[in-house]
Amino acid sequence: MSLLRRWFDPIRSRWFYDKPSRQAVLPTEQGLSVYLRLDDVYSYLTAQQLPQLEEILSDELKPLKVIISNTAAEAPNHMSEAEWKQYCLNDAQILAKQHRFSFHESPEQPTAEALQQAEVILKNTPLRGQDFLYLLEDVFNMLWQQQYGKLRTLYAMASRHHRLQHFPERIFRDTPVLASYFEFGERQYHGVDDLLRLTRRLKQQKLLTGNPIFMINHIEWREHLISDAEELNEIQAMDPELDLYIALEDPISWLLLAYIKEELADYYNISLNLYPLSYRSRDDFDWGLATRLSKRTGVAFTPFCRPDAQAAQNMALLYCSVPEEQRIDALYKIMQAVWTKGLDLSYKAHFQAMQQELGLSELSQQDIQAYLAENDMHCEMKSQPNLPVLELRLDGQSYVFNSLYRVWMIESIFSNVLEEKYKVESAAENELRNNEERKG
């Protein structure tokens, strides 16, 4: 690592973190836009929120611009198109259950014919404003609820009685779109995962005329779904296990590891297993995102020194040199030193200081690159689009998810498992009671 980076990173990161948090006022000249794809399941979920959002937008942002693309962007993280589509269907089903979106029990990708019919309906309709958004929601419902008969009827009417319309707030493009997103003030917000952040921003700038009520079952950081002592004991007795696959040069890895260790592991009696991954250039990250996550989770952050490939390798070496039963605490200390104390573990003096703090008289002779490559392979087998990858095992079931946007699933899964357990027990009790009544 260069001397400039080692010296300047801690200073710059501390300044960035401590600078006044007054939000810049984002420009409104371009209004608010939403980018959708008819064959994108996240767009289906997003479309269900648009009529309500339009209703509370100030006149300054009306009408909401709807940009519909017919081109999918390349799948992330080297996933195949089929893997990505299946991941999206599974993930959207989880989101729909959590936030009570409309969703089919057995979702399927819409057919090419249905997509073509839907596009004609939306291009030809004379409806505008909120009326168009309700039609858009209905069309998405027909596509994703497999209501192809209704869609054909609407298509026939649109083809015979309407002509192609041209409205500035309704645009059809072939610009690649991976998943639905909003654009405001030259910033992008995920269509579902960032909707609350977007509405907070709009409310802050006094661009909403009413209180936004979206994602009512959203689980906030440091908010526990389970607080009843009896229910908590039941989860703890199930001995949940959580695997984390993390990139050591990524600050999100530190923030989520610290959050899970400090806030969830002891509370729910979760056994953690950590799998460091080989360096993948994630030290080039969004400083603003990491800072926001730190402040929302309450996890310490900065001054840091972004690890390069050699520093990440040395972090893994230290981790592997510690006895297995001490490795969770050891990696916590290693990442804490890098991300809150500004240590550069590619620098000999810093490395030796960390080695001494961990009480290591000698280092592991293990092939670290081979160890990391094996972790990489197991991580890739999970077919997830982003890092960190998490796998939760509980009550004989395994649940795989990823990234800071899905940490809430840990609490949600616990709650769902308990709910299902109580349903089964209640059904068994009713059956027993009915049998006894029949005998009597």
Which positions does each model-derived feature cover?
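Structural alpha/beta surface segment adjacent to cysteine/selenocysteine redox centers
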Residues: 38, 42-142, 254-341, 421, ...
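Short boundary motifs at domain starts and secondary-structure transition points
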Residues: 20-27, 230-238
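Aromatic-acidic/polar surface patches that form glycan- and anion
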Residues: 172, 187-188, 249, 308-311
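C-terminal cap of thioredoxin/glutaredoxin-like
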Residues: 3-7, 11-14, 28-34, 43-56, ...
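A broadly tuned preference for mixed-charge, low-complexity surface segments
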Residues: 86-94, 231-241, 296-297, 372-375
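An acidic- and aromatic-residue-enriched active-site/binding cleft used to recognize and process polar
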Residues: 66-69, 194, 247, 277, ...
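Short pre-active-site segment immediately N-terminal to redox-active cysteine/selenocysteine motifs
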Residues: 36-39, 246-249
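Residue-level preference for long, well-ordered alpha-helices that form the structural scaffold
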Residues: 81-84, 88, 160, 249, ...
